[in-house]
Amino acid sequence: MGAQWKVKHKEAAANAKGKIFGKLVKEITIAARNGADTATNAHLRLVVEQAKKASMPKETLDRAIKKGAGLLGETVQYHRVTYEGFAPHQVPLIVECVTDNINRTVAEIRVAFRKGQLGASGSVAWDFNHVGMIEASPDTPDADPEMAAIEAGAQDFEAGEEGATLFLTDPTDLDAVQKALPEQGFTVLSAKLGYQPKNPVSGLSDEQMAEVEAFLEGLDNHDDVQDMFVGLAG
């Protein structure tokens, strides 16, 4: 489970896609504050690529960019906020939210942490490495992730989901590595900054794991939650 927890069971494909679009629109809006040109705005370029891979309609994508760049005259201001704490059984996690109302979000996150423990800033961040995370799939069966990591400038790599590879980078190298991976035989599926646990919790029973997953799913269902990084082995 490690770096990033993902919901295992989506209720419906349409709802799942709608939620993905909602998260991407917020991310695009924030990124576009630094300019609407993807050629000069690396963060925006990364998120736009993710939106295209998710088949976001062009109209939705363009509107989000213009909204973030202030070209539509709208005043909605999104803020990125990070919460730290523990899931049941002292599993550390970092929760990233994007919200237009911080007071509302923190109150609702406190409620969501009822069965866990919401901590102060820095309470678990020390137990994670801040890294770039690039999920990429091999173009051919013989593509070598170790060689690709070395040649592209990644710090490390690990097996991802469905045959993909997760390449880990220094945060400042994220854009350069994701640009270099296609030359090494890998198609980039997503690229972002995230947190890698240093000491993931292991040895939980099936019952304990079920409690942790139920807690995480409840958090993930919150509209303002963009990402969760969980110190859980498996």
Curated annotation (Swiss-Prot):
One of its GO terms (cellular component) is cytoplasm. It comes from the Bacteria. It is found in: Cytoplasm. The keyword Transferase does not apply. Keywords: Cytoplasm, DNA-binding, Transcription, Transcription regulation. It holds the Pfam family TACO1_YebC_N. The keyword Nucleus does not apply. One of its GO terms (biological process) is regulation of DNA-templated transcription. Gene3D superfamilies: 1.10.10.200, 3.30.70.980. HAMAP family: Transcrip_reg_TACO1. Belongs to the TACO1 family. This is Probable transcriptional regulatory protein Pfl01_3677. It comes from Pseudomonas fluorescens (strain Pf0-1).
